[in-house]
Amino acid sequence: MEVDADLELLTSLLEENEAAERNGVVSHEASSELDEFDELFDGDEDGSYHGSDNGTEEQTIGGVEEDFTTLFGDIDDIKEEEAAASDTKKQSSSVCQEKSKDELEDELRKMQAQMKKLQEQLQKTALAKTSSPGNPKKSPENKMVQSGKTSRTSPLIERKKTDSNTVAPQLTSPTVPKAKLPDAPKRKQNLSDKSPVQKKMASFLSPPEKSSARPGQSTATQPITNTLKSPVGQQYHVEKFSGLRIRKPRVSSSEMERKMNGRKLIRLAQLQNKIATEKLEEEDWVTFGVIVKKITPQSSNNGKTFSIWRLNDLKDLDKYISLFLFGDVHKEHWKTDQGTVIGLLNANPMKPKEGTDEVCLSVDNPQKVLLMGDAVDLGTCKARKKNGDPCTQMVNLNDCEYCQYHVQAQYKKVSSKRADLQSSYSGHVPKKMARGANGLRERLCQGGFHYGGVSSMAYAATLGSTTAPKKTVQSTLSNMVVRGAEAIALEARQKIAAAKNVVQTDEFKELMTLPTPGALNLKKHLSGVSPQANCGKEGQPIQSISASTLLKQQKQQMLNARKKRAEESQKRFLESTEKSEKSSTLTSSACSVFQSPKQGAEFPNAQKMATPKLGRGFAEGDDVLFFDISPPPAPKLSTSAEAKKLLAIQKLQAKGQTLAKTDPNSIKRKRGSSSEELVAQRVASHASTSPKSPDENEPAIKKHRDQLAYLESEEFQKILNAKSKHTGILKEAEVEIQEHYFDPLVKKEQLEEKMQSIREQSCRVVTCKTCKYTHFKPKETCVSENHDFHWHNGVKRFFKCPCGNRTISLDRLPKKHCSTCGLFKWERVGMLKEKTGPKLGGETLLPRGEEHGKFLNSLK
């Protein structure tokens, strides 16, 4: 056999040659060894063999065997071949020693020629990239990762190219055997042996999960929460073809451009229409979707297992397509996680289930499915159902966090709060909650207060909390009798009397003895109230008066008392004036015409209110002047003032001076010449004493130039540009405040946009065949009379009339006219009514006036 002959030749060369020649021989020997293992790789690429190191054999042979056993793993056939090879080596050792050196040289030339041919073949095929010669040896893990990144190059062929330069160091450094790799790459078929359809498929989609596979990495399915929630603070770019944000992408954008070159992109929403109207078999087409649901693998009639995936593009979550995986496709991709973005190449349409218009697809090759990564925006609704369980509806987190069934309730919840106080409670407290222990006051005041350095209790005891709970009294005949007003008044008086007889405590007495305003007011009140006023008349019942009525009564009493005092004072004043008139003499001409009241009068201001009397103060026969236009006489000086005035005039006359009369028409006082001279002297003396500063002698232009130079100086600019070192912290705080303010508004806007985009909604409705109607719930008469009604799925649609009236219909169109305007011009709208803000002036301006629907000419 050729294998035995080569092994014998290698053994003889290793034993006879010198240490310098041994390295060269070993390099040719290793390359020939690799040639012999080509058949083994071609036979089974996926297998890995492992064998233990033989300590009795030579170092070089053991190194080669250990290298290959590390690569391939444990198989019994290889062990038997190794044992047979060791026997042949021992038998041929004696024969090899008898060969001459010429034969060895010829054999070496042949081996060198074979190595050159092998290198030329490797360069022509270009199956793998040559590794750098600086790496003495590669571990099986590194080989596996590199083989996955290249175009499915086998590890053994990659090793052949590297061993041509590094075989000697590898033989001298034996490797440690490792365990069998869990994820071994599968062999890829040559493109030359494939059909044209397979060539297209291989150029578009290759299993991307193998390119990122690592030894020891678990292939178990991850929980769906990892694919639904996106980390906070990370931004993901939108993939060009699928229109989705992808986490951990497995295919680069340039690779996707190359794969999509010359192929038609069809969206999932358009797929049903495209299958019905176009012939997709004549061209290459691709569609993308997200695995929103995985049905448990099932078994077909022939015993084969298949699985079903629900795909959606996250645009319309109510509509999805079903992808069936059979045979090799199921074996290859059945472990794919939910929430993965996939691409399908030339999927085959299937017949839908009877009674449904669902789109069903299938693929016949695993490489027609491209795994692109995890969808970031796929999630579940954050609301809860009426029974308390979390909602399981799928949502697009990039659009809204709530499904179409809970978005309206969440919008009402957000809108009921103030925009500035989104996190606080601003609603009205129900009375029933305020009375009990769960009221707003009790819930807010649980920990007490600390104000002004003094701690206080949480809240004062209210009347409702202090009163003992009412006990149920057994009803008797006396309780059922209606009592009259006198009985109720008697009971009230008894309660008041019992309250007066309350024994006062020592603490209350001590507080009353203190000179505080409260104690003084209470004493004054208690001393002023008579017991008769409290009890009232026996026959009159006690009436309850409100505070406003009591204030009005008190004000009226004060006005009455003031009026009474004014009348009394006026009466006394009139009596005093009459007495003074009688006592006055008739001949007193020196008295004033209008005499003032005497000092004993108590009400002088009431003189105007008195009745006038003609001729008061005049005697009979005196002349009365009603029109006296003479000026009033000058006031006369007293005798002492007159004497002083005369003395001053005499002194002036003795000095020869006279007083000039003042001009009555003069407006401005004239200054004398002496005063002007004094002012001029004072100004001159002040100017001579004050020193002149040098700055005053400089021109104003130079001062202005110096000021501008200082403003442009480096020192002033440094002061001007000085900023606080806490500016960054301040900006961060402002950003946080803005986010805290705008986040609720952004969420509210997302809810509004989602509600406006929802034009129809699936729901459960009931149809009564007896009454011939369809509604959300049956009538009471239908239930009581056992009519023929049944529940089924329906679609609720939203419509709007031009007048603004809105309605809901379970049919294609509403069956009734508008109840407001009577028109039948219904228009499809969203769930939420569009908000109309303030209009501009151009929108409300009517240059021709108000437009009328009918004119006079139209009536003819």
Curated annotation (Swiss-Prot):
Gene this chain is encoded by: mcm10
Organism in which the protein naturally occurs: Xenopus laevis (African clawed frog)
Region called Zinc finger-like 3, residue ranges: 801-821
Compositionally biased region (Basic and acidic residues): 98-110, 565-582
Region OB-fold domain, annotated ranges: 230-380
Acidic residues composition-biased segments: 32-46, 64-84
Feature: compositional bias, Polar residues: 120-134, 144-154, 164-175, 214-225
Biological function: Acts as a replication initiation factor that brings together the MCM2-7 helicase and the DNA polymerase alpha/primase complex in order to initiate DNA replication. Additionally, plays a role in preventing DNA damage during replication.
Domain notes: Each zinc finger-like domain binds a zinc ion and is involved in both ssDNA and dsDNA binding, as is the OB-fold domain. The N-terminal domain mediates homodimerization.
Subunit structure: Self-associates.
Domain of life of the native organism: Eukaryota
Region (N-terminal domain): 1-145
GO function term, MF aspect, one: zinc ion binding
Region annotated Disordered, chain positions: 18-225, 553-591, 657-700
Protein name: Protein MCM10 homolog
